[in-house]
Every structure is written in C-alpha cells, then in structure tokens.
A protein has these predicted regions:
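Conserved alpha-helical scaffold segments that buttress catalytic/binding sites
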Residues: 1-174
Length: 174
C-alpha cells in the first residue's frame, strides 16, 4: 500500500482496517504490515481509519493527532450518513480484509472480532471510490474456503463500478 500511495500522492488516505497500523516499527521493521498507515502519512496529509478496533498504546496516542481520524466499527454507518466531503481533495482507498468481521472473512492473517459487515465495506467503497486516485485490497489469504477472497473480489468490482460511474458523470456521460 505505501508504495502505491507514494506513487499517486493523495491528500487523504482512507483505509478499512481492524488495526491502526500506526507503529513506528514492528519487530525492527519500519515497513511491517503494522506500520503501513504510519508510512502512508509521510505522503498523505490525512488518514481516516474506518473499523479500527485494536492498537498499541503508542498507536492510540499517534491516532490522537490532527492528521488521523479513527472511526470505530459501531460508528461507520454514522460516518457514511454524514456524507463525508472530500471536496476536491484526492484520496486513496485501502481495504484490509481484516476490517470485516472474521465470521464473514476468516481468510486473513490477524483476525479481530466485532468487525464490519460486508454491506458496510461495500458502502464505504461506493462512497469513497469517486474521489480516489488509487485502491487496493490487502491481507487476504487462503485460510478459509474462499470467503475472504470472494469478498475482496466483490469490493474490487464495486470500486471499479463506482469510480467509473463518477468519471462518466464528471465527463457528462450519463
């Protein structure tokens, strides 16, 4: 994710993730999966982390800074209802599949209970996609019967459709 964000240099990084990923380093590695959002903030001006439900004490302290907004799973629907306004700021959307509740997407490396429903993930993708210059889905593995991969594929499709529809509207092609 971090190199892709660096390539498109968005102003806002939006991620669906169970974890804050704001560590300075993890096991001596500044590029660990536990440090992604911290690295991204070297490029993006702001990070919005949707669905986060775990992090170290230092990560929660870093999340208190002005450039980070954390939206708990129970508050994601309210965030969507408030119709987030990106204005003319560019965004990058990253979906870490562990944002989903592990009951619907167990195929990930670090499951956390009480996650988001597929509908919530889809709604975030549809809302943010029109503002995006980049998108990814990460941390999907084969530890289940394909549930996580199927959800990831559907979210990719939703992104492509929503992004293309917004581009068509902007070009005047209805």
């Amino acid at each position: 994710t971090a190199p892709a964000v660096d390539a498109v240099a968005p102003e806002v990084f939006v991620c669906l993730d169970a974890h804050l990923d704001l560590r300075e380093e993890y096991d001596g590695n500044a590029w660990s999966h536990a440090c992604v959002t911290r690295r991204v903030l070297q490029t993006a001006e702001e990070a919005i982390i949707l669905g986060a439900r775990t992090g170290s004490e230092a990560e929660w302290e870093r999340a208190d800074a002005e450039d980070v907004t954390v939206v708990a799973p129970d508050d994601v629907d309210d965030w969507l209802a408030d119709s987030p306004d990106f204005g003319d700021r560019s965004a990058y959307l990253s979906v870490d599949i562990d944002a989903a509740d592990p009951g619907v997407a167990p195929g990930t490396g670090t499951m956390e209970p009480f996650g988001l429903a597929p509908r919530q993930l889809r709604d975030v993708v549809r809302t943010v996609a029109p503002h995006c210059e980049g998108f990814d889905v990460v941390e999907v593995n084969d530890r289940d019967d394909g549930q996580a991969a199927a959800l990831a594929g559907k979210l990719c499709r939703e992104f492509v459709f929503a992004h293309a529809a917004a581009a068509d509207r902007a070009a005047g092609d209805h």
